[in-house]
Amino acid sequence: VETLKTLLVQAQIFEAAGDAPRAMRMFDALSRARTQEVNSPALLNATRIKLDRGMITPPTAAGIYDGLRYRWRGDASELKTIRTLGELYISLGRYREALDVLRSAGNRQPDMPDSQAIQSQLSNAFKALFLDGDADGLEPIQALALFYDFKELTPMGADGDLMVRRLARRLVDVDLLDQAAELLKYQADERLDGVPRAVVATDLALINLMNRKPEQALAAINSSTSTTRISQDELVRTRLPLLRSAAGEIE
């Protein structure tokens, strides 16, 4: 076993020195060893080199990494495998699988040195989806389901607020008004207070009016005015009278 470990280190040295083909051949041979503490990191490295050199496709590499993470558990090799797999899934547009694998790793091994990096990767992936627009290629209802399944990743503050409002606008654009209202109500009730809550509540009221639900629109308006000094916010101050008037007309 010690000899195999020495060879594994030598392969890493060859790669660091720029001799990737020789390193890959050594990793390939070591990946067939019977000892998991040798064959798993060897397969991890061999697959990475082959992918970098265009010898295998990203889906093929993802399949290898996915199988590898079940073979070797409990050390840095597993977490490195998971981080790479998460990146591959994201590049392939397999967002749910990416978030699933990253979240499960962080929950299972929170004290490992790389665990914090995985948590950061998970948060960044979620932000890329719902703040930077990577999820725009998904159907709105699919994006909503993905958001709800990982809603604990929604950041507090302005970024989280913007995520929810962007997603709600997408739902409104395809006439999914009930779903948009439910999303904004969750954000207003559970995650916001003060002026930010009032702004989201007015968006919620507008959607309820579009959906011909004036009572819910008025409830949203009244809940927002009870938690903040609306007069301090010009946007909210100018919208509320219009919303109340429209809600009264629909009633």
For the regions a protein language model found, what residue spans apply to each?
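Acidic, polar-rich low-complexity tracts and alpha-helical solenoid repeat scaffolds
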Residues: V1-E251
